[in-house]
Amino acid sequence: WVRDNTQGIGTLTFVDQNGKYGALGHGISDVDTGELLHIDDGALYQAQIVGNQKGSSGSPGELSGLIHYEAEKIIGSIEKNCEQGIYGKLTDMSGLSGLKKMEIAYKQELEIGPASVLCCVDGEIREFEAEITRIDMNHEDTNKSFVIQVTDPELLDMTGGIVQGMSG
C-alpha cells in the first residue's frame, strides 16, 4: 500500500532571510511502521494552537491545534524529510512579522546555562526562560545532543515543560 498524506502540528526551528526553513527537529515517520517517510513534495499549512494537554511524569502532554487545509492557508512547501526534521521554503512569511531576528549557533557553540525557547501555547508566539543542562556531542542520536529544561514558571504552569508539538 502507499501512504499519500501525513499531518501534524509542529514548530518551525528556523527561517532564513530567503524563506528557507527547518522544522520539527525530527523526521516524519510512518505511524504504522515507524519508518521515516519518503516525501517527494508537500505543503506547509498555517495552523492554529487552540489548547494543550499538560505533561506529567509518564505522560508527555501535547499541543492541540487546527490545521487549515484551504489553498489560501498554504504558507510553504515541504521539500525534504530526514532524521533531523523537515525542510522547505516559506511562500508566506507574514506570520513572522514582529518577531525579532536571532543568530543561530552551531551545536559546537552550545554552552550549559540560561537559554530561551520561543513557542506558541496560547495563540501567540512568546519567549520563555529555559536552561541547557547537559551537552553530549557524541550522542548516537544527533537529535538528542543536548538537554534543555524549561524554567519559566508561566510555561511550566501551562504545559509542565516541553510537550509534543514543541519539538523543533
Explain the meaning of each model-derived region.
Residues 1-168:
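C-terminal recognition in membrane/secretory proteostasis and scaffolding
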